[in-house]
Amino acid sequence: TLDRSSAASDVYKRQLGNGGLGRLAACFMDSLATLGYPAYGCGIRYRYGMFKQQISDGFQIEVPDNWLKDGYPFELRRPEYCYEVKFGGYVQESTDENGELHFEQKDYQSVLAVPYDMPIVGYDNNVVNSLMIWDAEPKNGFSLESFDQGDYDKAVEQENLARNLVEVLYPNDNHVKGKELRLKQQYFFVSASIQRALARFKKHHSDLKDLPNKAVFQMNDTHPTVAVAELMRILVDEEHLSWDDAWDITTRCVAYTNHTIMAEALEKWPIEIFQRLLPRVYQIVEE
């Protein structure tokens, strides 16, 4: 026989963050499942999550918490739903025979966002929603050509780009590299999640103007707010809707909860970093 208590105690606790923001997100997911609302929670599958605390001579020491070292039985990898997320490069503008402007991102770096589903079980109602957390994988992987030429850093550049995105929650942003990584993390899971949601919608519906009647994106504090501009980018550039139609859809299917007015929670990004990492998204923000 299976002792559920014993089995559960053998599973290493996933350390994907804590605090009020994470607690509220967990409450949202628990309530949605218990009330029978179909919903996905979206985030990043951090390889180390929060740090593991050790005490030495009365002082705290933070060490990596490798919660995935023995695998995690309650997650399901879904490679069939992977999406490309692009960073950097430049935007090329062109005009078609009808005088319509088109925008294409060129010379970018990209990673593949691969979702892992975790079950969120409602209370006594046979409802199971999903926590969909995204892992980053290289699009091209190891470059044997660069390695054979002695350029070892370039050989693993794509692998490192992907790995760095999902290493830890809240990387130190007291320096430029840290700020860049945080912005990349936020855009990474937002872009992948919106691409997935729109793909699900289009599988069953043909008119994107009906999206606000079928779905809502709940932004939990400021960290995922680039979702507004990313949804506009996809609707305008990839689905070829007019700006006004895209804006009407976006304003009716995106919601936001603000948790605090503390300065560290109300994020600001240097224009140089935002424009360099997300050139097309920056254009939309400017517009």
Residue ranges and their predicted role:
Residues V228, M232-E286:
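Extended, well-ordered alpha-helical scaffold/bundle regions in very large, multi-domain proteins
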Residues Y46, Q53-V63, D148-D151, M232-I234, ...:
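Short secondary-structure boundary/capping segments
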Residues L208-D210, T225-A229:
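Glycine-rich phosphate/ribose-binding loops and adjacent secondary-structure elements
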Residues N18, T34-M118:
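Extended, regular secondary-structure scaffolds
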Residues R77-N220, W269-E287:
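Active-site cores of enzymes that catalyze phosphoryl transfer or operate on phosphate-rich substrates
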Residues T1-A8, Y12:
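Single conserved hydrophobic/aromatic residue that forms the stacking wall/gate
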Residues K13-N18, R45-Y48, V216-T222, I234:
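Conserved short loop/turn motifs at secondary-structure junctions
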Residues M29-Q54, S242-M262:
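Glycine-rich phosphate/pyrophosphate-binding loops
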